[in-house]
Swiss-Prot record:
GO cellular component: cytoplasmic stress granule; mitochondrion; nucleus
Keyword tags: Biological rhythms, Cytoplasm, DNA-binding, Mitochondrion, mRNA processing, mRNA splicing, Nucleus, Repeat, Repressor, RNA-binding, Transcription, Transcription regulation
The protein, known as: TAR DNA-binding protein 43
GO molecular function ontology, one term from the record: RNA binding
Organism: Xenopus tropicalis (Western clawed frog)
Gene: tardbp
Length: 409
């Protein structure tokens, strides 16, 4: 008996597929499910009354109608539950894909020139794609631009492209990015990666082609002069993050990929650490063999004792400031007058601190003892009573006898 083919389709309106029958004229259900996974039977439309009629199924075997298979188109039957689940899955996937494609956000444009209008902004960004909204923020009182604005595109791919580069608008470089709604301490996900251990024969185009296999590359930067590393920027931050920590082979050389730390993170750390990062040099100095009544002491007078003291604990100074202070002390006494004035405002001073302070050794100090053979007028530093020995006698005579200066307690 010659093999017969019957026409089977998933839907009446679709193009049918021919399926072979067995020698006895029956069709195995396994033959149908091989072409239509999940199928559980066949049905056809009765030519007489146009009603759908099912094909008899016995133990996995489909039997032909009374008049044979004929030239009819047989439609595949699916279990209702499976059909419903498949439809829901397809609909859900379609919605997710649609949302992913159409989701766009307002982008903030920073650094706009004062003269830029909303029409100027729209004309510029229209070169990238369809613009559905532009706004230049203005001062409510003056009506002048605040130097930033917002733009929204109709297409998500256009938005990604615009965010991946800087823009020259009316003669000024501007940045276009998503408004940062995160807290200052929360790190932003970077789309840029650092590629270390590069060789000089690796060009920017070769790096672009290599990394394009992982995702869309929007920029490749190799610093000049060559320093054995490069930066690669992706359109998607997830691609960049997935490559961080990987060792990749480019032109037979192993390169290491890590996160490119944004500059603003370093600035933020500097702000947390203070203006001068590093250990504080307040309460530190050059120890000497004898105690001092203050961290920075200066005792001057014509055969006068005592000492005027000044504590540097209130000042957080670094080595550069310390060196500058030392140079100023050696070259001019004007610096001492300034420090004395600051002492009177911020720190304790006394005319006779010697007894109490001499009993404890403070290793962080500067001391300077100067004697001049002069009894001329005093530029007062310390107590008004010069007899107490706590003063700064600034009279200089031609018959200077001696000067002893030392850094000590």
């Amino acid at each position: 008996m010659e093999m017969e083919y019957i026409r089977v389709a998933e839907d009446e309106n679709e193009e049918p597929m021919e399926i072979p029958s067995e020698d006895d004229g029956t069709v195995l259900l396994s033959t149908v499910t091989a072409q239509f996974p999940g199928a559980c039977g066949l049905r056809y439309r009765n030519p007489v009354n146009q009603c759908m009629r099912g094909v008899r199924l016995v133990e996995g075997i489909l039997h032909a109608p009374e008049n044979g298979w004929g030239n009819l188109v047989y439609v595949v039957n699916y279990p209702k539950d499976n059909k419903r689940k498949m439809d829901e899955t397809d609909a859900s996937s379609a919605v997710k894909i649609k949302r992913a494609v159409t989701k766009t956000s307002d982008l903030i444009v920073l650094g706009l020139p004062w003269k830029t209008t909303e029409q100027d902004l729209k004309d510029y960004f229209s070169t990238f794609g369809e613009v559905i909204m532009v706004q230049v923020k203005k001062d409510a009182k003056t009506g002048h631009s605040k130097g930033f604005g917002f733009v929204r595109f109709a297409d998500y791919e256009t938005q990604v492209k615009v965010m991946s580069q800087r823009h020259m608008i009316d003669g000024r470089w501007c940045d276009c990015k998503l408004p940062n709604s995160k807290s200052p301490d929360e790190p932003m996900r970077s789309r840029k990666v650092f590629v270390g251990r590069c060789t000089e024969d690796m060009s920017a185009e070769e790096l672009r082609q290599f990394f394009s296999q992982y995702g869309e590359v929007v920029d490749v930067f190799i610093p000049k002069p060559f320093r054995a590393f490069a930066f690669v920027t992706f359109a998607d931050d997830q691609v960049a993050q997935s490559l961080c920590g990987e060792d990749l082979i480019i032109k037979g050389v192993s390169v290491h990929v890590s996160t490119a730390e944004p500059k603003h993170n370093n600035n933020r750390q500097l702000e947390r650490g203070g203006r001068f990062p590093g250990p504080s040099f307040g309460n530190q100095g050059y120890p000497n063999s004898r105690p001092s009544s203050g961290a920075l002491g200066n005792n001057q007078g014509g055969n006068m004792g005592g000492g005027g003291g000044m504590n540097f604990g209130a000042f957080s100074i670094n080595p550069a400031m310390m060196a500058a202070a030392q140079a100023a002390l050696q070259s001019s006494w004007g610096m001492m007058g300034m420090l004395a004035s600051q002492q009177n405002q911020s720190g304790p001073q006394g005319s006779n601190q010697g007894q109490g302070n001499q009993q404890r050794d403070q290793p962080q100090s500067f001391g300077s003892n100067n004697s001049y053979g002069s009894n001329s007028g005093a530029i007062g530093w310390g107590s008004p009573n010069a007899g107490s020995g706590s003063g700064f006698n600034g009279g200089f005579s031609s018959s200077m006898e001696s000067k002893s200066s030392g850094w000590g307690m």
